[in-house]
């Protein structure tokens, strides 16, 4: 315990000393709490994430940061034509991890993200792309095995999103095709959560998709056919379909969603059904959020199993620019075996001092019944253009 507290103190000192610029990609915590009912109000993507719209940049500049400023591209120094949108994200991270082993704790300071964003729009059609470097805390040791569906060379350049879309209006029908995450779940920014990591939405697991849907302030629906990324050899080898329907309630301060996904590969198949919910309690500046999924796992060559992946938490937004989020999680590989569950608790403190900048501190502990707890501390410093 003292060792982990030492990590916390040391990391806080490093945070105060460094204060490198930062920002985050997409926060589902800002749905309802910021006045936006749809993620696509702030992002060009129909499901949120990626480049910000003019509405989203105005919100960053005037409402979501501690001190107001210009959320425009390049802080308003460069005015882009209407058909062209650009962006960039830079993130550096300090990671400390302690799994109880004799050589613990371990720590690393590494570049976590360096991405460029591009959007070309022509009437109702657009091309969108995100490209950059794969984050890596340490250099890989040893050769990559054949058939592992991992990049087999040291080239760390990757495009995690690129797609063409047809969307005549910010509300109504849309179609898009390319590489991106199928709309599903809470879409937390943290890829380590079980509802992302263990359901096919981990870091760099974007699939190639044909997706369509319909967006309204009161509701939205998305249907996606997906296949593996054979171009860059990243992600999973699953192919299948996913659907997501969300309904806004209580004067658009709450949302309830139902979702299904079927995925199949040589390793087997899995059918997922789940519910997602959010409720913003304005007088308390509190957003409750949760997701629960039951998975029917059908591995090749062995008996099927019922699994569970869930998350429940809350975000407290006391003043402009400050967001405190806590949540608990569980992933059970077999609901018939009480020892199969892994539980986790996470706390995130995010500060948006000025448009384009964010500082975040993350503390996480996770443990199974049969093993020691794994404690992780992550400090992120992120800037977006």
Q: Predicted segments — roles?
A:
Residues 68-72, 84, 112-116, 157-162, ...:
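Hydrophobic, lipid-facing positions within transmembrane beta-strands of outer-membrane proteins
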Residues 38, 358, 373-385:
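Outer-membrane beta-barrel "beta-signal"
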Residues 238-334:
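Detector for outer-membrane/organellar transmembrane beta-barrel domains
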Residues 36-46:
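The canonical Cys-X-X-Cys-His
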Residues 88-90, 129, 175-177, 212, ...:
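Membrane-embedded beta-strand positions of outer-membrane beta-barrel proteins
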